[in-house]
Amino acid sequence: MANTKVEIRVDTTASKEVYVCGSTKSLGAWDPKHAVKLEQVSATTFSVSKLMATGEVVEFKVLSGKSWDNVEKGSYGEEIQNHLLTPSKGLVEVVEVAKFNK
């Protein structure tokens, strides 16, 4: 299966460091110790580009540190579902994060 470059962009004011951890090896294989740090590109936007298998559904969470203690939360502190993406050429996945657990 061919690979394609996917950009994950996170918009948040809730953290100075942002990581993604997900279902593929390129996103840490659900091990937060291997979570991928995003680069801060503006005051509230973080971004990373990764090669992923085209057409394979990928799940991920956003973290404010390399621990599940730092996982993203909803606006009221509630748990949220995993983000899903299906890599395709030129895909830019934009996620807004209101809060983190810590």
Segments and roles (model prediction):
Residues 90-102:
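Compositionally biased low-complexity segments at domain edges in trafficked proteins
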